[in-house]
């Protein structure tokens, strides 16, 4: 399966693009914008069908969107003057993976643990507990191992949580306050270098993403060649 990586750079004159990619945006709205780049009429789970993973990147020139998919997004489906898209295939990078190769990696993920029912009741914990600091780093090391990577260096930085509200399809606007489900995905950005231990596991992790919250900008694993350590 061919994978594509697209960088979406919002047009400076598009207030809509700046709003949708900016801080405090509705992550559900951003998800809908991303999915609008792909054909309609597919079965449920359209994100999985098109292999979509995405992440907002803060750059000196403003916020950009990185988008991975199994078919190129269609820029004609965006509003006029919304953004510029640049797409390239990831196959050459993925095909060249081999054990021992050193890579740069980046992933904004949602590190959590799910305590058992007894532990939750005893300590009055929620069903999902966000991880921070050393606990988040340890979570990443486990995820990297399962993804065919041996972590060499790691920098972790908390980023704003992905927050939104979800409503049943038949809920009226007047009843939304009573029937909404709160969505909250704690997020940490992990950067560093790693050595490839299992290319097949790594390809699967790139294809499938890491962790939860993938519809809300979590889980995209980006890799790039790095010089081998001396």
Give the ranges of each region predicted by the language model:
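RNA-interacting cores
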Residues: 1-230
């Amino acid at each position: 399966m061919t994978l594509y990586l697209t960088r979406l750079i919002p047009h400076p004159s598009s207030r809509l693009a700046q709003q949708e990619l900016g801080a405090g945006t509705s992550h559900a709205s951003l998800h809908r914008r991303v999915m609008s780049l792909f054909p309609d009429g597919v079965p449920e789970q359209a994100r999985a069908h098109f292999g979509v993973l995405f992440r907002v990147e803060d750059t000196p020139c403003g916020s950009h969107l990185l988008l991975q998919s199994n078919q190129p997004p269609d820029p004609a489906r965006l509003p006029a003057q919304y953004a510029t898209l640049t797409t390239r295939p990831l196959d050459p990078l993925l095909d060249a993976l081999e054990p021992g190769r050193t890579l740069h990696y980046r992933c904004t993920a949602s590190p959590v643990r799910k305590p058992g029912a007894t532990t939750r009741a005893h300590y009055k914990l929620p069903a999902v507990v966000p991880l921070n600091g050393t606990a988040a780093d340890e979570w990443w090391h486990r995820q990297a191992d399962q993804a065919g990577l041996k972590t060499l260096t790691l920098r972790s930085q908390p980023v704003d949580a992905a927050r939104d509200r979800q409503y049943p399809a038949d809920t009226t606007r007047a009843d939304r306050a009573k029937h909404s489900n709160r969505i909250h995905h704690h997020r940490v950005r992990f950067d560093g270098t790693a050595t490839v231990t299992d290319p097949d596991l790594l390809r699967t992790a790139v294809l499938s993403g890491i962790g939860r919250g993938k519809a809300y900008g979590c889980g995209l694993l980006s890799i790039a060649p790095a010089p081998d350590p001396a």
